Amino acid sequence: MNRVAFLGPHGTFTEQAVWDFELDDAHLVPVDSPSQALAAVRSGEVEWAVVAIENSVDGAVTSTTDALIEAPGVQIYGETELEISFAIMTRPGETLASATSFATHPVGYQQVRRWMATQVPAAQFRAASSNAAAAELVASGEVDVAAAPRRAADLFGLEIHA
């Protein structure tokens, strides 16, 4: 069985990338950062790590670049490209009009900030450790809106508005 570290929780774009590698026997290990994912490889806790390297809007993912520099001996074995599409979600029954806060990963923020500024102007941004973690923040009532993968809405029982 291949153990694979990825930026968690379940429902992230990084988890989606894991499935693109078709590791049928993969045991997924969610971690909180690219640095933790690569450290898990170095320690032998997992055989593989899947981390985001770049995106089309904001360029290089600096937290991953930094983590690779700090992880001598770790080798890149493959890559995949994902079509990224954010869903805007709330707790069931809530509206975007009443939202005062929203969360997403800082890299994701660069991709949705203009839309959020025009569609939900009262919502103040809060950084989350991942886009799916932003959905968890909505589910727990800590923020009103998340920009996250559609799968995160399913996993955390949220309603998609856009």
Annotated model-derived regions:
Residues 1-162:
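Domain-level signature for soluble enzymes in the chorismate/prephenate branch of the shikimate pathway
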